[in-house]
């Protein structure tokens, strides 16, 4: 939503209130004016039913706190994307069981929202028990860079086991892909042999 943070939050609250109202069978044929089309509001139903998580982009600690409060009020599953200042709220994120989607090469501020981003964000979040997931800034064509980028997080304190989970098991479990993401009986998996450290640029 365009405008201030307060306006964006108000808009989100309105959308979820209307989506929840529309879920009631007795309201299906009502002519009440809604904040979005019925088709758009129905798209929110799987979130309200906790079938899928809501992914919210939030980088500032204050915005992350507001996202946590919103998810608690709505009783929905939440994933925080960005989380440049997630290290400041590692405890509350872990307590609430909220996973975070982070870009490990986001060490320099790209906006005022990311002024306090740091390389060891992933390590600090993991130390507190937060489920960390790596992404390539939302650009699918950069997915090939995730493996060496995970090496940056390792260089700044994240264990190799945790980095591997951030690329495999954690995204799979967070988004409901129950039969992939780890090596175990009954799971679908590929086994890859590397010529060296898979998190460096050199091995093939």
Residue ranges and their predicted role:
Residues 43, 88-89, 121, 182:
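Short acidic active-site motifs
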């Amino acid at each position: 939503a365009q405008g201030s943070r307060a306006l964006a939050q108000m808009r989100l609250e309105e959308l979820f209130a209307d989506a929840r109202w529309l879920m009631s069978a007795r309201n299906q044929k009502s002519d009440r004016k809604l904040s979005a089309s019925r088709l758009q509001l129905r798209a929110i139903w799987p979130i309200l039913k906790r079938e899928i998580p809501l992914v919210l982009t939030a980088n500032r600690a204050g915005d992350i706190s507001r996202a946590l409060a919103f998810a608690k009020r709505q009783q929905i599953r939440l994933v925080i994307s960005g989380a440049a200042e997630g290290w400041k709220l590692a405890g509350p994120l872990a307590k609430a069981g909220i996973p975070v989607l982070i870009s490990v090469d986001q060490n320099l501020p790209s906006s005022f929202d990311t002024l306090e981003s740091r390389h060891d964000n992933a390590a600090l979040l993991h130390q507190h028990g937060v489920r960390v997931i790596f992404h390539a800034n939302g650009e699918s064509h950069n997915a090939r860079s995730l493996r060496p980028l995970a090496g940056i997080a390792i260089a700044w304190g994240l264990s190799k086991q945790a980095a591997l989970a951030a690329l495999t098991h954690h995204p799979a479990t967070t988004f409901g892909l129950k039969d992939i993401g780890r090596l175990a009986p009954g799971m679908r998996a590929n086994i890859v042999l590397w010529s060296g450290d898979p998190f460096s640029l050199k091995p093939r």
